[in-house]
Amino acid sequence: MSFSIVGDARPNSFEFETEALIKPSGFREYDARWWFGHPGSAQLPELNLNGVQALGMGLGTLIRRVGAGPDIVTGHDFRSYSLGIKLALVSGLMAAGARVRDIGLALSPMAYFAQFALDVPSVAMVTASHNENGWTGVKMGAARPLTFGPEEMSALK
């Protein structure tokens, strides 16, 4: 599976539906956040589901590279679109050979707890935290109880 990464694409266009859109500016120091958009928004999305799938493939590759193994806990927040984003992330993780333990709808601390309860070193929590509807993001880690820092985020980018 491979993706062509695009810089900009209009929603509901052929390019938007077939290429991976994932803005590099979304990779922050300790997590990743993008404007996913919502109906009626004038702001163009910074991420699409193919982009999330590409992120999952990169994350699945990175957790093995750092020696964390293939197992990872995933969860998603309450936003109406977060489940779809998580499923795209999981698809990419599995394409990279990850074994996913999904806990479903959760708060971030629940995902971190699940790392210990399920004895899984890595985590990927789909959440936009305190940001308004339309935003999405992923908090990630591969060495419980720590989440990714600048070095890991730079490697993932």
Where are these regions (language model features)?
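Gly/Ser-rich phosphate-binding catalytic loop and adjacent alpha/beta segment
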Residues: 2-28, 32-157
